[in-house]
Amino acid sequence: MLRLKKNQQRELEPVTTKETWSKELRAKIQELLETYFFEPLIDATKETTLDNAVPKTLAQHIKSGLVWYDGAYFRGKKSVALSKEIRSLGGVFSTSEKAWRLPENRMPQDLRNTIAERRRQAQVLTKQFSEVITKLQKQIQLSAPKLNFDVEAAKTDRALQKEMQRKVPASVSIQPVLNDEQKAHMATDYTENVQLSIMGFIDSEVERFRKQILPQIQKGMNRKDLAEYVQERLGVGKDRAKFIARQETALFTSKLREVQYQKAGIEKYRWRAIGGKSGDGRTRDAHMEAHGKEFFWDHSKNKNPVRNSEGQPVHPGEDFGCRCQAIPIVEEIK
């Protein structure tokens, strides 16, 4: 225990989580999302037959999937020739929908037959795509418990120890205090949290596909547009992988710091919000309010702890996307 003068405090330099610490975890999560979810979905959107003929008429465009009829409007590709043909059939262009409107009962029979056939194909594609996302979701639910991130946890731990040795003064003795069993327990929690985050994202994506995309496929959305949408969501998946990696790494390092500080007799810290009391436009109100205040690492000792959206007490850096810092306070005693 430190022996210094009474009634004085000394603030230590904060040890913050580095962006590089989550790099390997981000790459691993991204690979999992691509391999087990997005790439199979992209494969499911590929055409099984090829037709190299260039469509010219409205019916040919509908057959090719470049244009589809949703029951009121023609959607998809637009051209002067198509506009002229639809207008000749009595169609009216809607500026609000940015599409041509034409009641089906005013169409010639051959065009109605083409639309009916395309609807049948759309039903088949809807069923196929629905089965694919259900199958992938079940596969990931079975695979997720087998995922292991112990290596990433160990590397993050080593990086944290190195950073603490660099920033904490030699007069403050902070040594690794976790035995192998404790480290294994924290690594298990880390892995389980990452697994839950991955599954949460997959479940939300499946729900999104069911609510937003399957109805569009049912109306006639073609494979090309479907593939483009999946590619767009793949980009979202990459962003999510980065977010999950950042968040879980921040939580893991926060827990490690908390244990080591307490073992060293450092029971309190001062909350430092980005932008101080005024924030910077991204800082949470509660975090701006906490700026400059002292808190115990032991939440049970805090009368008014900072809480997340779920009502759980949190330290700086533990809430989603939180960039705040915990400034360790060394209490000087006789």
Q: Model-found features: residue ranges?
A:
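Ordered, soluble secondary-structure elements with a strong preference for glycine-centered loop motifs
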Residues: 76-77, 200, 239
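Accessory DNA-engaging acidic/polar modules
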Residues: 52-112
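Acidic, glycine-rich two-metal-ion catalytic cores of nucleic acid-processing enzymes
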Residues: 235-236, 240-334
